[in-house]
Design a protein with these regions (language model features):
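Alpha-helical transmembrane segments in inner-membrane proteins
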Residues: 2-376
Length: 376
C-alpha cells in the first residue's frame, strides 16, 4: 500500500475552508504572471477607490466652492499643472484648511484600523477580533475621560493636546498591562490566554471610566462625543502628529505579511517553518497597537472598521496577507472617508458621530457574513 504524501504547509498555499474553522491546503496555485496581474489590478482598484473617496470628501461641505470645482482646484495646486479652476483664495482656504485635514486624517485612521484589525485576526487566528482587542480603545477612552473629568486646569500649559497625549499613553499602557497579565498566565504558549487577559483588563478600564463619569456628570456629553468618534475640528497638526506612527506601524506589518500567513497554520507548524512565534507575535501586536493608539488619540473610538473591512477584502481577493494588508489599507482609508461624508450629510447641518455611521454599516454587514457563513 502506497503511503500518501503529506500536503505542503507553506504560507502561499494556505486557504480557509468555509465549512470548518481550520486552515486547509490548496494543491494548485495560480501561475506567477497571472497572480501578479491580478494583484496589480486589485491594488489599482484600491487606489482608485481611495482617490475617489478623497475627492468626494474634499468636494462636499456647507460652504466653499461648488463640488465639481474642487478636483480642478486640487489639480491646479499640483506642481507643473496650471488649470483655471475658478476657485477664489477664500474658497481654497476652506478646502485646504478645513476639509482636507479632515479627509486626510480620516484616511489615515481608516487605513490604520483596517491594517491593525487584519493583523490581529491573523496573529490570533480569530476572525472576530479587532484592533481594540487588547485594550487600546478602553485605555484611550479612560485617558481621555481622566483629562476631561479632572479639568483642563491640571493640564494647562502643556505643549501638546492633553486629551490626545493622555489617551495615547493610556492606550499603550493598557495594552502593555494586558500583555503582562497574559504572559504571567501562559500567553506565550497560548494566544487565547492573551485574548482573555484583554477581556479582563478592558472590563476593568471601562469600570474606572464609568466611575469617573458618574462623579462628573457635567462632562458626560463631551466624553461621549469623544467615545463615539469624531473627525470634526481636524487640523494639519493632527495629521502631522499621527502620520509617523501610522507609517512605522504599516511598514512593520507589511514586512511581516508572510509571517501572518504562517500563523494561520498554527503555532507548532509556524515553529517548524522557522518562525520565532513569541517574538514575531510580540512585534506584530506592538506595531498594530502603536498605530491604533495613535489614531484613537485623535479620532476617538470608531468601531467596526478594523473588523469588517478585512473581511470584505478577504471575500474579494482571498485570505493571503500578501494582498490583504495593502488592500485593507486602501479600502479602509476610503471607507472611513466616505463614512465621515455620510455623517456630515445625514443630519446636516448637525453631524452624526462617525462611530455611529460605521456601526450602522458594519453591524448589518457583519451579521450578513455570519448568516452566510462567510466569516473567513
Amino acid at each position: 500500500m502506497t503511503a500518501v504524501e503529506p500536503k505542503p504547509t507553506t504560507p502561499e498555499c494556505v486557504e480557509r475552508d468555509e465549512r470548518v474553522d481550520a486552515p486547509v491546503v490548496s494543491e494548485i496555485s495560480a501561475p506567477p504572471v497571472t497572480r501578479r496581474r491580478r494583484e496589480t489590478t486589485w491594488v489599482l482598484a484600491g487606489l482608485a477607490f481611495l482617490v475617489g473617496a478623497v475627492i468626494v470628501g474634499a468636494s462636499i461641505g456647507p460652504a466653499g466652492p461648488p463640488g465639481w470645482r474642487v478636483p480642478l482646484a486640487l489639480l491646479d495646486h499640483l506642481p507643473l499643472i496650471s488649470i483655471d479652476s475658478g476657485v477664489s483664495d477664500a474658497e481654497w482656504n476652506i478646502v485646504w484648511q478645513i476639509r482636507m485635514p479632515r479627509v486626510v486624517l480620516g484616511g489615515l485612521v481608516g487605513a490604520m484600523l483596517s491594517v491593525a484589525g487584519a493583523s490581529y485576526q491573523g496573529v490570533f487566528r480569530n476572525p472576530l477580533v479587532d484592533p481594540y482587542l487588547l485594550g487600546a480603545a478602553a485605555g484611550g477612552g479612560l485617558g481621555a475621560t481622566l483629562v476631561l473629568t479632572t479639568g483642563r486646569d491640571v493640564t494647562a500649559g502643556w505643549p501638546v493636546d492633553p486629551v490626545q497625549f493622555v489617551a495615547f499613553a493610556f492606550a499603550l499602557g493598557t495594552v502593555a498591562v494586558t500583555y503582562s497579565v497574559g504572559a504571567s498566565f501562559g500567553a506565550k504558549r497560548n494566544g487565547a490566554t492573551l485574548v482573555l487577559a484583554g477581556v479582563a483588563v478592558v472590563s476593568f478600564a471601562t469600570a474606572i471610566q464609568t466611575f469617573l463619569l458618574q462623579r462628573n456628570l457635567d462632562v458626560v456629553r463631551e466624553v461621549f462625543q469623544w467615545i463615539l468618534g469624531r473627525l470634526s475640528g481636524a487640523t494639519w497638526s493632527d495629521v502631522v502628529t499621527v502620520t509617523p506612527y501610522v507609517v512605522v506601524s504599516v511598514v512593520v506589518l507589511m514586512l511581516h505579511r508572510r509571517h501572518l500567513d504562517v500563523f494561520r497554520v498554527g503555532d507548532d507548524e509556524a515553529t517548524t517553518l522557522g518562525v520565532s512565534v513569541q517574538r514575531t507575535r510580540l512585534i506584530i501586536v506592538a506595531a498594530a497597537t502603536l498605530g491604533t493608539a495613535a489614531v484613537v488619540s485623535v479620532s476617538g473610538l470608531i468601531g467596526f472598521v478594523g473588523l469588517v473591512v478585512p473581511h470584505v477584502v478577504r471575500l474579494m481577493v482571498g485570505a493571503s496577507y500578501r494582498l490583504l494588508i495593502p488592500l485593507s489599507l486602501l479600502f479602509g482609508g476610503g471607507f472611513l472617508i466616505l463614512a465621515d461624508v455620510a455623517g456630515r450629510q445625514l443630519m446636516s447641518p448637525a453631524e452624526t458621530p462617525i462611530g455611529v455611521v460605521t456601526a450602522f454599516v458594519g453591524a448589518p454587514f457583519f451579521i450578513y457574513l455570519l448568516r452566510t457563513r462567510k466569516v473567513v
